[in-house]
């Protein structure tokens, strides 16, 4: 194989491919996290509609619903950033998805070595996402437990509800 003009003779194409694969894997994982948040948001929308029609609903159920809504908003902010500030072109800290997306956008159409900044962005995003995944799993477990509790309290069916 003959290198193209402009390619360095000591170019490590395998290292470039490995970095792009690492970026791709992280992008896929963050997309899955975003999909989980979207599904949780829809489940909470149905739960909100079901709460007033639940036969044995208590104030604690409403408080738990509010807690879950706030936690979902926090998780969305951590993964995707603040959409309000972004719409107003305000300066915001980069979110996990913006760091991964920025690297993917800036590096996937090239055969050049990733920059140190790109490497640092992926390392930072991967580290933050590992911590985030644990929090997301905990939230999803809490949501499932809450749905089960509502089912026992006589709530109408909502998406994601499991058979007991």
For each of these PLM feature ranges, what is it?
Residues 1-29:
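Low-complexity, Pro/Ser/Thr- and charge-rich linker/hinge segments at domain boundaries
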């Amino acid at each position: 194989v003959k290198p193209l003009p402009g390619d360095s003779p000591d170019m490590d194409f395998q290292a470039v491919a490995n970095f792009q694969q690492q970026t791709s894997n992280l992008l896929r994982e963050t997309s899955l996290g975003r999909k989980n948040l979207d599904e949780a948001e829809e489940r909470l929308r149905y739960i909100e509609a079901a709460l007033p029609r639940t036969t044995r609903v208590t104030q604690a159920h409403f408080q738990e619903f509010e807690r879950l809504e706030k936690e979902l908003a926090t998780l969305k902010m951590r993964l995707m950033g603040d959409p309000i500030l972004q719409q107003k072109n305000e300066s915001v800290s980069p979110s996990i998805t913006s760091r991964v997306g920025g690297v993917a956008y800036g590096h996937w159409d090239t055969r050049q070595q990733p920059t140190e900044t790109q490497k640092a962005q992926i390392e930072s995003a991967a580290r933050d996402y590992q911590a985030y995944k644990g929090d997301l799993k905990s939230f999803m477990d809490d949501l499932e437990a809450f749905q089960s509790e509502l089912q026992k309290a006589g709530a109408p069916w909502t998406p994601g509800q499991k058979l007991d």
